[in-house]
């Protein structure tokens, strides 16, 4: 039962909050070492797509959580491990009695465990949305600390702008010069074990990410990204051969650059224009109705 204080806040608020949980794209991912606790040290160039999940937050007499979207059924039945609920509970514990009950609806448009930060983006969107709904005034540092407790990717998803991420993902540096890219996200909808990908790494002390651009134009960025790597892609391709196939399909349909994001299995192809990206996504979807293809544009560094 709600306390009288919670009831008053619930009755006084009739608004709802909507947050977008943007797909996180690893344009480059270099594994540079491993800590004694087992966590791998990474250098990453990260951006975010216009496409993603969507979360609605509405005051409610009791807590509730509902799902929809193409991939909502995958999460159904596993709500106990859902990062959205973990984020809600963690933020509520930090805020205290002002955190009245809320109904959360998640429209799950991103594939599960696919290397584009869907769960982390959902958790970050929950922190942002409930902070607004509950009228909380947490310092940015405190909110970032809560995000890190939920996972190494959540702090960068909290910002959802182009970043260089180092350490285990918690050391963030904005990249305001990064342009927007027309892109197709592609996934064969086959799971990849992240621990197994890391276990199969041939080398865990690789050269750090270097992005020295004299003229940061789009073509220069493309060249710099092409010269970088995703060190997780070779072992992921060993586990899921479809990753190589889907990358080749993107190239065959005009992608200027292709790469796997995160630990997979999502790959991205960068295209010259959004029209070209949309045409490619439509053709790829017709070729493989059982796979995931999504044309999108990434955010620019000046978001």
Swiss-Prot record:
Pathway: Isoprenoid biosynthesis; isopentenyl diphosphate biosynthesis via DXP pathway; isopentenyl diphosphate from 1-deoxy-D-xylulose 5-phosphate: step 3/6. The keyword Iron does not apply. Disulfide bonds: none annotated. GO terms for biological process: isopentenyl diphosphate biosynthetic process, methylerythritol 4-phosphate pathway; terpenoid biosynthetic process. Keywords: ATP-binding, Isoprene biosynthesis, Kinase, Nucleotide-binding, Transferase. The keyword Nucleotide-binding applies. It catalyses: 4-CDP-2-C-methyl-D-erythritol + ATP = 4-CDP-2-C-methyl-D-erythritol 2-phosphate + ADP + H(+). GO terms for molecular function: 4-(cytidine 5'-diphospho)-2-C-methyl-D-erythritol kinase activity; ATP binding. Belongs to the GHMP kinase family. IspE subfamily. Catalyzes the phosphorylation of the position 2 hydroxy group of 4-diphosphocytidyl-2C-methyl-D-erythritol. This is 4-diphosphocytidyl-2-C-methyl-D-erythritol kinase. It comes from Rhizobium johnstonii (strain DSM 114642 / LMG 32736 / 3841) (Rhizobium leguminosarum bv. viciae).
């Amino acid at each position: 039962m709600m306390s009288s204080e919670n009831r008053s806040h619930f009755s006084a608020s009739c608004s709802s909050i909507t947050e977008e949980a943007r797909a996180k794209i690893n344009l480059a991912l270099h594994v540079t070492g491993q800590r004694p606790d087992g966590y791998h040290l990474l250098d990453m160039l990260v951006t975010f797509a216009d496409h993603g999940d969507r979360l609605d937050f509405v005051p409610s007499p009791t807590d509730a959580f509902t799902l929809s979207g193409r991939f909502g059924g995958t999460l159904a039945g596993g709500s106990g491990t859902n990062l959205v609920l973990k984020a809600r509970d963690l933020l509520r514990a930090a805020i205290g009695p002002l955190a009245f009950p809320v109904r959360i609806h998640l429209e799950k448009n991103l594939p599960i465990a696919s290397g584009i930060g869907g769960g982390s983006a959902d958790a970050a969107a929950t922190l942002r949305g409930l902070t607004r709904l509950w009228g909380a005034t947490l310092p940015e540092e405190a909110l970032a600390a809560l995000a890190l407790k939920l996972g190494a990717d959540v702090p960068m998803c909290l910002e959802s702008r182009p970043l260089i991420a180092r350490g285990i993902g918690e050391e963030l540096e904005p990249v305001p010069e990064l342009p927007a890219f027309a892109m197709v996200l592609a996934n064969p909808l086959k799971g990849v074990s992240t621990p197994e990908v890391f276990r199969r790494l041939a080398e865990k002390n690789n050269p750090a990410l270097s992005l020295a651009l004299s003229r940061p134009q789009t073509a220069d960025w493309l060249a710099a990204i092409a010269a970088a790597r995703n060190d997780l892609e070779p072992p992921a391709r060993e586990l899921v051969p479809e990753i190589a196939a889907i990358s080749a399909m993107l190239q065959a349909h005009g992608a200027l650059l292709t790469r796997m994001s995160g630990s997979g299995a999502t790959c991205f192809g960068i295209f010259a224009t959004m029209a070209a990206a949309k045409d490619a996504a439509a053709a790829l979807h017709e070729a493989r109705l059982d796979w995931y293809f999504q044309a999108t544009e990434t955010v620019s560094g000046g978001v």
